[in-house]
């Protein structure tokens, strides 16, 4: 009997030992503001697969991770498996990221917004999977639009007229500090986002097309930037030329702007203690430049990708599939109000309770505009810098729009080839 028991038990022990041997550990980079969420996701993945994810906290300023990534990838280090990536880094690191197209189930890929997934498809490879997304949105004083009987504007021209009318009437009513529109016109990456939104929604593309064609020196772009230049000093203060997200948000949340372009996080901050506009805020996709064009909020999602030098590519890809999947995206939305990149979650009751505006703004995520980081790759930062500096000069009156865009196009033709 003992012999029979041993004979029966040995194969089971062997299977258990084999199962233990198959357990793997992958090294994962995570944003510092999301560390607790990453730990929670790693725990859930271990419960499901038996594998472990070692979570490494990235620098507080995410851009400081770029030289760290460059060093690790240049050394072909196997110390890191999974990288946390900004959308504009994908082109920069695409040569060192694993193609996930055959490692992530097609159904899981298709669950995401097409534009979000498309931003990670470079050189016919899927170099990363979306973790969550941001997109430029328009916030507005719904109480003031109701007060003056104004509909939500559908075009930038309508916004311009409505902003000026309400601004002037509110000033006449004893509110001298109010402006029609607060946005980001400082000379920095945020202006690249704002300007691309204007140009793209006017049918002008996104500076450089996916095939490498420079598209900025065209009438649609001239028209869009000229319109924005006209806002300075009329519906936007001169100080907007130094506004980033936080400076413009402060103006809106103090009650001194009718319209405000920013990222989805402003929904939460505008309803927080200290805001002067609690329960007075509406939100909508950005207007279009011309009828028939798409609202083109700048796409700002974050991704997870796998290092090409990982010694455990299949396991690392499995973690990426898990952490970017529906369950973990719902967890991030409910726990911390992160915006999912999976459309199905936009009708989820638990998610909508936490982020109620999602049900009204799904189209903004679907129609978003992509910065040209895919084609430009490692030269993206130089391309963006040339763009936002040129646009800032135009807005401030230091350069004419049409000649400035022509000169910019010539400069971009050279910069794009140094990718």
Please annotate each region the language model reported.
Residues 24-33, 51-58, 81-82, 127, ...:
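Short, well-ordered beta-strand elements
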Residues 33-54, 387:
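Short, polar/charged alpha-helical segment
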Residues 44-112, 119-121, 143-154, 251, ...:
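Extracytoplasmic "Venus flytrap"/periplasmic binding protein-like
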Residues 71, 79-81, 108-144, 179-180, ...:
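A structural signal for short loop-to-beta-strand junctions that line the ligand-binding cleft
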Residues 86-135, 176-179, 191-194, 278-284, ...:
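Hinge/lid segment of periplasmic solute-binding proteins
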Residues 127-131, 136, 160-213, 257:
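Extracytoplasmic/periplasmic solute-binding protein
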Residues 163, 210-241, 286:
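Glycine-centered hinge/linker elements that transmit conformational signals in sensory
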Residues 265-278, 289-389, 417-419:
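C-terminal lobe and pocket-closing loops
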């Amino acid at each position: 009997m003992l012999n029979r028991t041993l004979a029966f038990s040995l194969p089971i022990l062997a299977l258990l030992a084999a199962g233990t041997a198959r357990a793997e550990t992958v090294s994962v980079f995570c944003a510092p503001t999301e560390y607790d969420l990453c730990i929670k996701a790693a725990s859930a993945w271990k419960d499901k697969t038996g594998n472990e994810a070692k979570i490494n906290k990235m620098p507080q300023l995410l851009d400081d991770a770029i030289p760290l990534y460059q060093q690790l990838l240049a050394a072909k280090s196997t110390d890191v498996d999974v990288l946390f990536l900004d959308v504009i880094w994908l082109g920069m690191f695409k040569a060192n990221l694993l193609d996930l197209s055959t490692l992530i189930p097609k159904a899981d890929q298709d669950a995401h917004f097409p534009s979000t997934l498309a931003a990670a498809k470079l050189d016919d490879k899927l170099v990363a999977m979306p973790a969550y997304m941001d997109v430029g949105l328009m916030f507005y004083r719904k109480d003031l639009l109701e007060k003056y009987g104004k509909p939500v504007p559908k075009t930038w021209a309508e916004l311009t007229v409505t902003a000026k009318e309400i601004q002037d009437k509110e000033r006449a009513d004893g509110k001298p500090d109010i402006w029609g529109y607060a946005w980001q016109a400082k000379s920095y990456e945020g202006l690249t986002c704002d300007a691309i939104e204007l140009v793209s929604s006017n049918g002008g593309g996104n500076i450089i097309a996916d095939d490498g064609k420079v598209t900025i020196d065209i009438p649609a772009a001239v028209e869009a930037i000229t319109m924005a230049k006209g806002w300075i000093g009329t519906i936007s203060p001169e100080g907007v030329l130094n506004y980033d997200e936080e400076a413009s948000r402060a103006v809106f949340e103090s009650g001194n702007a009718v319209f405000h372009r920013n990222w989805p996080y402003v929904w939460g901050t505008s309803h927080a203690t200290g805001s002067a506009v609690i329960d007075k805020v509406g939100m909508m996709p950005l207007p279009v430049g011309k009828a028939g064009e798409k609202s083109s909020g700048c796409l700002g999602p974050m991704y997870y990708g796998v290092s090409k030098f990982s010694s455990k590519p299949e396991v690392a890809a499995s973690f990426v599939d898990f952490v970017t999947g529906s369950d973990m995206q719902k967890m991030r939305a409910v726990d911390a109000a992160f915006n999912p990149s999976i459309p199905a979650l936009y009708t989820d009751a638990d998610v909508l309770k936490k982020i109620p505006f999602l049900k009204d703004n799904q189209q903004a995520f679907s129609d978003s505009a992509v910065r040209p980081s895919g084609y430009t790759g490692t030269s993206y930062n130089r391309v963006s810098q040339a763009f936002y500096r040129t646009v800032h000069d135009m807005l401030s009156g230091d350069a004419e729009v049409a000649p400035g865009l022509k000169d910019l196009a010539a400069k971009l033709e050279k910069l794009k080839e140094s990718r």
